Amino acid sequence: MSLTSMCITATAMCCVTLAWSLHRASRWRSWAVTAWARPRCSEAWWACCRPAAAASTLAGQELTGSKSYERVAAGVGFVPQGRMIFPYLSVEENILSGMQGAPAAPIPDYVYEYFPVLFEMRRRKGGNLSGGQQQQLAIARALVSNPKVLILDEPTEGIQPSIIKDIAKALNLLKKERGFSLIVSEQVLSFAMAVADRYLIIEKGEFVHSEVRETVDRERILRYLTI
């Protein structure tokens, strides 16, 4: 996946310019972006906002200006900040909504294997789940579209630490089993370091630092994140 020459104008005082690429053949299959302006980056990758200028492709397919269902069909999965599940639909119906446009099929077994609480609560309304359970539901809904790239925006927001660890473990196993790349926009450093192979730091709208898992300097990253 590549994103080049992008300028996102979030407010009159904020312009973020990025140029980057994620190669499927690369050993860096999981990226974490942290620090200032994270949400706008995730929105731009998903194309929820309209960059002033951008070129976005996935596996050679042009995604710039495409509609959400076209991006899903192309292989982009998105788990938005705040989860945005359907509160009045059951857990099962929420997951099935992610399969719209795909060949008719039951919910894949691996979804309930990695998120067993969703099977236990499959008849319960999504709005009645805890924050951590809703986050697992949002991830499951994105996974059933069989994405090539899965983008998560602030996945740990409002979730208790024990559930955060469970989600990190599930994502690490799933990306190996399902073969997708992972992009995480996150403020909880421990989660980012648990799931990512490479870390990018944004400060004042620009990438200012990049590290890989094997040589990561946690203290240096923390200095960027200290207010």
Task: Describe each PLM feature range.
Residues 165-178:
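Helical segment within the ABC ATPase nucleotide-binding domain
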Residues 62-83, 108, 120-124, 216-222:
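ABC ATPase NBD coupling module
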Residues 46:
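Helix-to-loop junction immediately C-terminal to a conserved catalytic motif
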Residues 150-154:
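Catalytic Walker B motif of ABC-type/P-loop ATPase nucleotide-binding domains
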Residues 144-148:
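A short, proline-enriched helix->beta-strand linker immediately N-terminal to the Walker B motif
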Residues 31-33:
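The feature captures the beta-strand-to-loop junction immediately N-terminal to the Walker
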Residues 89, 129, 142-143:
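ABC ATPase signature
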